[in-house]
């Protein structure tokens, strides 16, 4: 039994657009992560990712330019870009780099909530404040992005009617741990790059 290899026209028409599509998914996903690393001051990782992003982009665009008569390479290039943005955001959500500040405002007594947050290892600042309807408790806690669901679970369990906002934190003082848990590789790299 012999297999016939596809001719150049078949390769150019079908296989090349597929390769361009996947190359764009990879380079745009890398670009999304690179931008996030730049925002988080992870300069070394941003540089390495930038190198591979541009290398893959040059390879993809050169194939499009060499095959200007194949409209499928244009479509693959654009679809790869769109898909790469989506995949890049999914990857970023999965690795969840960085810290967040959760601001909780509640009219209900927040003693139980703050105690559970402290027991879970989160630093908590609890202030008396005054809102439109009277006295409120204002609670601040800084957590890693991957731990925000845990914090919100506690808020909903102990103060289900509390109002909360979540914001990105660019920098957390090194000697104050966000959560005293085992650090992953990205956390260790971020701490090393700040020094």
From Swiss-Prot:
Main location: membrane
Membrane topology: Multi-pass membrane protein
UniProt keyword terms in alphabetical order: Cell membrane, Membrane, Transmembrane, Transmembrane helix
Cell compartment(s), UniProt: Cell membrane
GO cellular component: plasma membrane
Gene3D superfamilies reported in the protein's UniProt record: 3.30.70.120
Transmembrane segments: 13-33, 45-65, 71-91
Similarity comment: Belongs to the UPF0316 family.
HAMAP family named in the record: UPF0316
Classification via NCBIfam families: PRK04164.1-2
Name of the featured protein: UPF0316 protein Pcar_2434
